[in-house]
C-alpha cells in the first residue's frame, strides 16, 4: 500500500508498470464503489465504465466547481446564456480525459494473467485501508490525483478513442472529436432558436377579441338572429304539422269513399247476375212459345 501511494513517478517505459499505474489511478478515482463486492476484470460492463468515467469528469471540472462556489442557480435561461461563454478547450480537455480513462479500462479488461490479479488485489486492499478516509472526505475526488493521472496517461502515447469508436457498430476515429463538438453546438443553437421563436410568438400575441365591446355586440346580434331563426323553424314545424293532420283527414275520407265504392260495386255485381238470370229465363219462355205456335 505504501509503495503504491509513495511511487507516483513510476518508470513508464515498462508496460507492466504503466498498466499498474493506470489501474491504481482508476481505482483511486472510483473510490465510491462498494469494497465488499469482488471485482472481475472480465465481467465489467462497458456502459457502466463509460457512465462512471463521464460522472468523474463532470465532478472534477472547474466549471461546475465555480458554479457551486458562486451558488449559481441552474435554470434553463442560465444554461442557454452561458453556452457561448463555455471555452472549447475545456470541453476538449474533458473529452481527452474521458478517452484516456476508457483506454485504461480497456487495457485492464483485456489483460490476463498474474499481473491483472495482483493489481486487483492491491486495489481492493488499498480501498479497504482507506475506507475511513473516504467517509471523512464524503467521497470527493482529489484534484491533484486527477492531474497526475492525466499527466501519466498522456506520456503513454496511446491513440485517443472516442466513446463512439468503442461501440461495435461505429467506425469513427479519434479525429472526429471536433466534428461531434460542432454538431453539439449546432443542435444547441437550433434549440435556442426554437425557444426564441416561441417567446416571440407569445409576446406578439394581441389581446383576445372576446374581451372587446365589438365582440359582445356581435354576439348579441348573432343571438337575436338565432332566436328569430328558431321562431321561424317552430312556425314552419307547426305549419307542417297542421298540413300533415289535414292530409291524414283527407286520406281517411278517401279511404271511406273507396270502401263505399267497393260496397256499391259489389251490389252492382249481384244485380248484374240477377239480370242475367232473368234474361235467360225470358229467352227460354220465348223459344217455347214460338215452338208451340209452329
Curated annotation (Swiss-Prot):
Compositionally biased residues, Low complexity: 153-175
Gene Ontology biological-process entries: bipolar cellular bud site selection; intracellular monoatomic cation homeostasis
Segments forming a coiled coil: none
Basic and acidic residues: compositionally biased ranges: 130-145
Subcellular location: Cytoplasm; Nucleus
Superkingdom of the organism of origin: Eukaryota
Keyword annotations of the record: Cytoplasm, Nucleus, Phosphoprotein
Renumbered residue ranges of the record's region Disordered: 114-178
Gene Ontology cellular-component terms listed: cytoplasm; nucleus
Function description: Involved in cation homeostasis and in the regulation of the cation stress signaling cascades. Also involved in bipolar budding.
Note: Present with 846 molecules/cell in log phase SD medium.
Protein name (record): Protein ATC1/LIC4
Species annotation: Saccharomyces cerevisiae (strain ATCC 204508 / S288c)
Classification lineage: Eukaryota, Fungi, Dikarya, Ascomycota, Saccharomycotina
Amino acid at each position: 500500500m505504501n509503495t503504491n501511494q509513495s511511487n507516483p513517478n513510476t518508470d513508464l517505459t515498462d508496460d507492466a508498470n504503466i498498466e499498474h499505474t493506470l489501474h491504481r489511478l482508476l481505482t483511486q478515482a472510483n473510490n465510491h464503489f462498494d469494497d465488499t463486492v469482488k471485482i472481475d476484470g472480465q465481467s465489467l460492463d462497458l456502459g457502466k465504465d463509460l457512465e462512471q468515467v463521464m460522472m468523474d469528469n463532470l465532478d472534477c471540472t472547474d466549471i461546475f466547481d465555480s458554479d457551486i462556489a458562486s451558488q449559481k442557480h441552474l435554470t434553463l435561461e442560465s444554461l442557454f446564456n452561458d453556452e457561448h461563454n463555455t471555452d472549447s478547450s475545456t470541453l476538449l480537455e474533458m473529452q481527452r480525459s474521458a478517452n484516456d480513462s476508457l483506454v485504461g479500462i480497456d487495457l485492464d479488461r483485456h489483460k490476463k494473467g498474474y499481473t491483472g490479479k495482483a493489481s486487483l488485489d492491491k486495489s481492493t486492499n488499498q480501498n479497504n485501508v482507506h475506507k475511513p478516509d473516504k467517509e471523512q472526505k464524503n467521497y470527493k475526488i482529489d484534484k491533484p490525483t486527477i492531474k497526475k493521472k492525466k499527466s501519466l496517461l498522456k506520456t503513454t502515447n496511446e491513440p485517443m478513442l472516442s466513446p463512439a469508436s468503442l461501440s461495435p457498430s461505429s467506425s469513427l476515429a479519434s479525429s472526429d472529436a471536433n466534428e461531434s463538438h460542432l454538431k453539439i453546438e449546432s443542435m444547441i443553437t437550433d434549440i435556442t432558436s426554437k425557444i426564441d421563436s416561441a417567446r416571440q410568438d407569445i409576446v406578439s400575441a394581441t389581446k383576445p377579441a372576446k374581451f372587446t365591446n365589438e365582440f359582445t355586440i356581435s354576439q348579441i346580434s348573432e343571438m337575436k338572429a338565432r332566436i328569430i331563426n328558431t321562431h321561424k323553424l317552430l312556425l314552419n314545424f307547426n305549419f307542417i304539422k297542421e298540413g300533415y293532420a289535414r292530409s291524414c283527414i283527407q286520406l281517411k275520407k278517401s279511404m271511406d269513399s273507396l270502401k263505399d265504392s267497393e260496397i256499391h260495386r259489389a251490389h252492382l255485381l249481384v244485380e248484374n247476375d240477377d239480370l242475367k238470370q232473368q234474361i235467360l229465363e225470358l229467352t227460354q219462355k220465348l223459344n217455347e212459345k214460338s215452338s208451340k205456335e209452329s
